[in-house]
Amino acid sequence: MSSLNVTERFRIRSLSIERLRRQALTLAVSSPLLRWRYAGNGTDQILIVPQELRAADPSFWSEIAHGHFGLASEIADLKGASPFRAEPPSLAWARKLHGFGWLRHLAATEDEDAAAAARAFVLEWIALRRLAHGVAYEPEVVGRRLISWIAQANMLLEDLDARSYTAIMQSIGQQIVTLKTTWRNAPDGIPRITCLIALVLADLAVSGHDRQLKEAQVALVEELKRQILNDGGHVSRSASVLADLVLDLLPLGQCFHSRGRKAPEEISVAVKKSLSFLRFMRLGNGMLARFNGVSTGSPATLATVLGYSGGNFEVMAAAPTSGYARLERGQTIVIADVGSPPPLEIATEAQAGALSFEMTSRRSLIFANGGFPGPADHDWDAVARATASHNTLCLAETSSSHLVRHMQLEAMVGGLPIRGPDAVVSEQVDEAGQAVLHATHDGYLKRFGLLHSRRLKLSPAGDRLEGVDVLEPPKGKLRLKQDLPYAIHFHLHPDCRCTESGRGTCRIKVSDGQVWIFSAESAALSIEESLFFVDSAGPRPGLQVVIRGTTFGETEVRWTMHAEQLDVTA
């Protein structure tokens, strides 16, 4: 951690002023003088029900029946108590509980007992939540709850007596008003978009609220244009947030058509760009590459999302605005991080993985970054975010990015953001059918006076990856006062096996039978322990190949990964 520079101090001051402005505006529109304008006309009714596109797990109902409530990778043992009275295992669990996204699992059972339980849960929540405060009334949680209740309205409102029906509809109406007055206080990024999607959906789906539709629609369009970059990536540089965004935006677009209204073009544009970027970031095993907050995920869910893009598509070769590069030859895919961290206010899950890469061959993941831990494993966050947990060079046991420790900033953004490298430049070329990437970052320049450059070259058949890592000053010659240790990490997926097969060489056996040989020229190579943080059961031990050495100011390390046993036509 290091002191803040003038630019960062100015940025924090600007964020503080913007936060105060949003809070003042929220306070103003929440006053009795203005709050009335957000109320509906008469008794609220559900006019349309959006399609639920997220996958559902009917077994969730049987778990509840046995007293277990599993959310956000944690399970609460209810012991006969209400989940709303139970002690939350974590803040993430509480947010999921009050967001009610889990209602879709009960709906998927098509069981009347499960449907009755869903209605009872909602009515109990209404009875217990008389005061609008706490986790349940964080803007993003309110937004997710509105989306969930409206999407499951057919189940929730079926066979209700007049009193219960009125209670649910009045609660929906009150929550719409609450969100319309508080959404500006949502954290920047996807939470703010979620709030606005919920408001637009509510204005379309609930009677009497459509007079504010234009206002919410304009705000949503502005956020989509600001947050979705030209190449389809999200401003946070996390690919995983886009899958959920698409699953919210697609039904929203359908709701416009159901109401006989034209959906804003920006919604379909955001969906198309997001789908294109998700295809770009998907490896051969069907999963997203693990950079900047990408955690556990389901290949089936991603495949479902990408299915909405149709069959005619061409995967981009690069995503320069988002800061990623993709090399693909034969059945081998390499995706590399060639970007700087996102803005401070949305960098709390960004990782120090400059010039790191992941690699799949056929459907097997070989080189994998540590990834971002799930909600139940946040104790590992700092380790997972460090450069040493990525497939790249780490100089003097120091990460290429730094955590920014500032109490006011942490309070505003909800965590520790990172900063640096300031400059990352890259170029992709084709050399006689070989996919080649050149990239350089300055994450070590201020502390050590050195740049880290990396060259990756993937053969036309995809059976050979050559790499060159270089440490050098930006110009001229440099002799350090003392030699600095470096380590180039190559983390293997836990399913891979690795054994030394000679000096500077090791043999990697992949789970599907492939065998690859990794070798390094004139450098010490070792096989060491590693951790894969994104396994659904928690951090999983594995192995990594590490090239270690020291630099006096200028160093070049060459390494090669080639297939010993690989049928590239399989």
Language model: regions and residue ranges:
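A short, compositionally biased
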Residues: 62-65, 318-323, 352-353, 432, ...
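Short capping micro-motif at the N-terminus of alpha-helices
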Residues: 78, 336-337, 368-369, 508, ...
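Carbohydrate-active enzyme catalytic cores, enriched for enzymes
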Residues: 198, 229-372
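Short, solvent-exposed loop/turn segments at the edges of secondary structure
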Residues: 194, 350-354, 388-390
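Aromatic-lined, polymer-binding surfaces characteristic
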Residues: 78, 90-271
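CBM-like, beta-strand-rich accessory domains located in the C-terminal region of large
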Residues: 2-3, 85, 143, 189, ...
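Extreme N-terminal leader/anchor segments
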Residues: 1-79
